[in-house]
């Protein structure tokens, strides 16, 4: 069977890099299996398990969100969290939970920053309008 290159990255670094005849991914539209010669595709990676058929056996990688890019017989995965299933421990699970909480807080901060920025712009317009009205009265 023909092989193709797969690289899986997480914030911690490269989780897997190598050639394989087959890899299956959890996506937001279900499980997709990629074989050599697959069409070019970019799709969202869902939480779940990536299954890689390797020469030394099946490898399973647990992932939590991200993106998959398939271009010219190369598969690149960027995951928010990724680890070999046999490496999963309480510590890794705690890290994933902490990361999710951190992302949630950052999103709240972003929304709050957006609200603050909008309020500042509105206040600047109000101030400018008020100064123009005051000048006209003088």
From Swiss-Prot:
GO MF annotations, alphabetized: ATP binding; proton-transporting ATP synthase activity, rotational mechanism
GO cellular component, one term: proton-transporting ATP synthase complex
Main location: membrane
Cell compartments where the protein resides: Cell inner membrane
Pfam families: ATP-synt_DE_N
Mode of membrane association: Peripheral membrane protein
Alphabetical keyword list: ATP synthesis, Cell inner membrane, Cell membrane, CF(1), Hydrogen ion transport, Ion transport, Membrane, Transport
InterPro entries reported for this sequence: ATP_synth_F1_dsu/esu (IPR001469), ATP_synth_F1_dsu/esu_N (IPR020546), ATPsynth_dsu/esu_N (IPR036771)
Function: Produces ATP from ADP in the presence of a proton gradient across the membrane.
Xref: HAMAP family: ATP_synth_epsil_bac
Database matches in PANTHER family: ATP SYNTHASE DELTA/EPSILON CHAIN, ATP SYNTHASE EPSILON CHAIN, CHLOROPLASTIC
Family in the record: Belongs to the ATPase epsilon chain family.
Subunit and partners: F-type ATPases have 2 components, CF(1) - the catalytic core - and CF(0) - the membrane proton channel. CF(1) has five subunits: alpha(3), beta(3), gamma(1), delta(1), epsilon(1). CF(0) has three main subunits: a, b and c.
Protein name: ATP synthase epsilon chain
Protein species of origin: Endomicrobium trichonymphae
């Amino acid at each position: 069977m023909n092989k193709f290159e797969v690289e899986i990255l997480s914030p911690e670094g490269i989780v897997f890099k190598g050639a394989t005849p087959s890899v299956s991914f959890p996506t937001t539209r279900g499980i997709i299996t990629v074989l050599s010669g697959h069409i070019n595709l970019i799709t969202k990676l869902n939480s779940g398990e990536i299954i890689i058929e390797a020469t030394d056996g099946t490898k399973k990688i647990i992932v939590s969100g991200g993106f998959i890019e398939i271009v010219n017989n190369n598969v690149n995965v960027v995951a928010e969290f990724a680890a070999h299933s046999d490496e999963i421990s309480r510590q890794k699970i705690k890290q994933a939970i902490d990361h999710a909480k951190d992302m949630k807080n950052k999103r709240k901060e972003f929304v709050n920053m957006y609200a603050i920025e909008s309020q500042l712009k509105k206040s600047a317009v109000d101030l400018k309008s008020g100064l123009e009205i005051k000048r006209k009265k003088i």
